[in-house]
Amino acid sequence: MELLTVTEKDGTDYKLYELSGGFNAYTLVNVAGKIYDSIKKTNVVLDMANVTELDAAAIGVIMAAHNDAEETGKKLYLLSISNEADRQILATGFKDEFNIISSVTEVA
């Protein structure tokens, strides 16, 4: 099982979480609480360029954070999605619901 490394960075009007490794039921505890706390205060960007695994539990965290963001007037952005993560998100049928960006300059 590959571990998930999470690097936090503050932007002007967002919190960036760079994710690297497997984002799954075993590793989501490393980031889920941080995402949920941050989304109440500011926009959140998940940099998923280096995500090597994404399972249903992790997608559930992303969807819940997306819904929380809408309720609080904030936005959750998915940045530079890896091929593996993209494949898994596409399989849910909800890809069009997410705010997918190529650069943090797109955060509005």
What role is predicted for each listed range?
Residues 1-53, 64-108:
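STAS-like cytosolic regulatory interaction modules
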